Amino acid sequence: MHSRTRAAFPLFAILLSALALRAWGLTWGLPTATHYFSYHPDESVVLGAAMGMNAFTGHLLPGFYHYGSLQLYLVNFANSLAFVFGGVNTVIKDLAQDHAQWARLYLIGRSLTVAMGVGTVWVTYALGRRLWGHGAGLWAAGVLAVTPLHAQQSHWLTVDVPAAFWGALALLWTAKTDDALRGDAPGRLAWRYALGAGVFAGLASATKYNMALSILPLLMIGVLERQTKILLVGLASALAAFLLACPGAALDTRTFAADVRYEWVHVSREPGPTFADTGNGFVYAVTHTLSAGLGLPLLLLALLSLGYAAVRRARGDGLLAAFALPYFCVISLASVRYARYAVPLLPLTALWCGRLLADWTAPRPHSLFVLRVSAAAAVLALTLADCVVLVRPMAQTDPRDRALAWLGQAPTPTTVGFAAQPWFGTPPLSPYFALPKPGGWRRFAPPGQPTHLDANGRQWSLTVPGADWDTAVLTHNSPHYVVLSEYDYRDALRLHDARALAFLSALRRGYAPAAVFTGPPPLFRRHGSIDGLPTQDLPHDMLYPNPAILIYEQRK
């Protein structure tokens, strides 16, 4: 018993570390008296769709299928359960008065993501142990626990980390199926494990549609082993689980088809300014997404581990590759290339790294064991440091809030202008700026020149362009201050947008820099600049907690 406890201690420590990294800063960007919506632009969409359902009134379909429905149901259930026990009020009538209750709904959904993120670390250990032994499982769990992208994305009420959780479970049950088929009694257990693998693959695709690819390893095993029953059980259970977790696919077919088609067209053909001219998708995924998401030391280790897998070509390598290769191709061929799309690959990356580290650090005569372990520990320590630096801004005052506080000290009356339509990346001079749809805040602004009365009784006059980078904001309205967000200018300047360049030229003639708000970049990344404005070398959706905010003041 004592030996079992001692053997379990490293895993417990890894899971505790994973929890700490994912819960640290969990309240970042939640609604407050100054902004009624999360600073993460997708969270309000997910929460709104989830809380739009009501089991007590028979409204059981979300009517929203841009994401799969499973996570919406889980968030709705968690918040409804909290309501039953008096932890939260799910009926929000006035955001100005009920913003604290609204924030709790977000927080409950985020806590669910944290649990699934930590759960993925455990599943990664279990899968690594089954494929390559206890040591490989521990190393793999340790790698995923400190992977920067996974830790960051596990903070948010979104679908990527939950989808990766279900996908990892599908792989674990597929590995069990494979072991059972090659064991002493393949007929007894294999089909049961195949049933579980299919169910988890169906739940993964009911969370995020492209996770339907997680059924491929099971199908590969069924074909290679010539097990028709495995194929049929896996496909049938996956389809049944998908329809149970996303019933709108069968009961609200027209809306479901329209939303899925919209996402297909958007992701495959409409890169927008954010991803325009970003080069080859396969190269971008490595040099931009994984470079930032893993950190340089872990990226190098991951590339080495892939080479090692290509040499070893063990059965487990084929199992992982059956999902990893098609999925990597899908996200690399897409026109929209958010870093979060790579999250389902992170457990597999950790597994390959874990196997390499386990073999690398295995005791051997005359093998420089201490040096090998020290090198492996150094990679994890550097990755942990990178993870901490990436997550830390969520535990600090957000640059948007710091900019708002700075403007709050300005003399009154104050007119503030913007280069582009204010949204989630803008200091909340209106508490409605971060509404899910850009420009939605105007519905809550008085007619004529928009104004906002803040919590301290200060009235802001807001000068907002009819079109982004309209120099009339400066030449006709002459606001006292002009606010720029990194989300406004980063891609516009990268693409040499003539309107943006003209606006900045006019801005510099009439205005002087007054304040800059940002935080430190992650390790192995750097602060850069475009046309003299600060930028951070991070993917678009990894920058949410820490965009640079610039304030210019009218020259005297």
Question: What role is predicted for each listed range?
Answer:
Residues 12, 199, 235-240, 310, ...:
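Signature aromatic-anchored transmembrane alpha helix within multi-pass, membrane-resident enzymes
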Residues 129, 170-194, 204, 222-224, ...:
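Membrane-interface transmembrane helices that cradle and orient dolichyl/undecaprenyl
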Residues 23, 71-72, 248-250, 257, ...:
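Catalytic lumenal/periplasmic loop and adjoining terminal transmembrane helix
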Residues 153-154, 160-163, 204, 209, ...:
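Hydrophobic/aromatic-rich transmembrane helices and adjacent perimembrane loops
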Residues 9, 13-14, 18, 87-97, ...:
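Transmembrane-helix signature of polytopic, membrane-embedded enzymes
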Residues 4-6, 130, 184-190, 225-233, ...:
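Membrane-interface helix-loop-helix junctions at transmembrane boundaries of multi-pass membrane enzymes
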Residues 99-103, 107-131, 169, 173, ...:
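Transmembrane-helix motifs of polytopic, lipid-linked glycan transferases
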Residues 21-24, 46-53, 67-74, 84, ...:
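Transmembrane-lumen/periplasm boundary regions of multi-pass, lipid-linked membrane glycan transferases
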